[in-house]
Amino acid sequence: MAITQFRLFKFCTCLATVFSFLKRLICRSGRGRKLSGDQITLPTTVDYSSVPKQTDVEEWTSWDEDAPTSVKIEGGNGNVATQQNSLEQLEPDYFKDMTPTIRKTQKIVIKKREPLNFGIPDGSTGFSSRLAATQDLPFIHQSSELGDLDTWQENTNAWEEEEDAAWQAEEVLRQQKLADREKRAAEQQRKKMEKEAQRLMKKEQNKIGVKLS
């Protein structure tokens, strides 16, 4: 039974190889036919009659042959010059306002000053009485509320007393702050000691409970 199955399998594989070979041959023959049918034959001859004719090219030396060789100006005898002068006169002068104006600077002469006489002027000197300096008179201000300025005496000890009072007040405040700080520190230390004592008591109680059990 096994031998017959092996022979049948071998026969099927042979048929499959034959069919695949035939299929490849058929595909190759079909491709060759398509390529042979798609080929395009190109013409080997060229028709020169269809090419457009080029225009005749002229040399650059012959371009100015037809140009005029002389120019005649009508209306001679200086008419052209007079027309140009009239046109120049009609044009406005744009730079007229830009011409600089030169002005002479004024000279200031300073005369040498003569020494002033601060004394009382008399007829011998040539100075005027309005230019002479007078001695300052003492100014005495009297008021009904403040009294005479000469009789007022400054109390120098008042400033020192105020400074002492301010310093004493600052010292009292500083001492009070220091006492409050020490009080808070003592309170915190007391609370810390109480917590430590409670913790030790709980620890002792736990030990006693363990021993009893």
UniProtKB/Swiss-Prot annotation:
**Membrane-spanning residues where?**
7-27
- Further details from the record: May serve as a prognostic marker for cancers such as adenocarcinomas of the lung and breast cancers. It is present and overexpressed in many patients suffering from breast carcinomas, its level of expression correlates with tumor grade, suggesting that it may be involved in cancer immune escape. According to PubMed:12672804, it is however not directly a tumor-associated antigen, but it rather modulates surface expression of tumor-associated O-linked glycan Tn when it is overexpressed, suggesting that it contributes indirectly to the antigenicity of tumor cells.
Q: What InterPro entries does UniProt report for this protein, alphabetically?
A: Cancer-assoc_antigen_RCAS1
Coiled coil regions in record: 163-211
Identify the residue ranges that face the Cytoplasmic compartment according to the record: 28-213
The record's induction entry says: By estrogen.
Complex and partners: Homodimer.
- Residue span of region Disordered: 178-213
Chain's role: May participate in suppression of cell proliferation and induces apoptotic cell death through activation of interleukin-1-beta converting enzyme (ICE)-like proteases.
* Organism per entry: Homo sapiens
Q: Does the keyword Metal-binding apply?
A: no
Which Gene Ontology cellular component annotation is one that this UniProt entry carries? secretory granule
Q: Is Membrane there in the keyword field?
A: yes
Query: Which keywords does UniProt give here?
Result: Apoptosis, Coiled coil, Golgi apparatus, Membrane, Phosphoprotein, Signal-anchor, Transmembrane, Transmembrane helix
User: What are the recorded GO MF terms, alphabetically?
Assistant: peptidase activator activity involved in apoptotic process
The name under which this protein is listed is: Receptor-binding cancer antigen expressed on SiSo cells
Q: Which GO terms describe its biological process?
A: adaptive immune memory response involving T cells and B cells; regulation of cell growth; T cell mediated cytotoxicity
What PANTHER family does the annotation carry?
Answer: RECEPTOR-BINDING CANCER ANTIGEN EXPRESSED ON SISO CELLS, RECEPTOR-BINDING CANCER ANTIGEN EXPRESSED ON SISO CELLS CANCER ASSOCIATED SURFACE ANTIGEN RCAS1 ESTROGEN RECEPTOR-BINDING FRAGMENT- ASSOCIATED GENE 9 PROTEIN
- Annotated compartments: Golgi apparatus membrane
Positions where Phosphotyrosine occurs in the chain: Y94
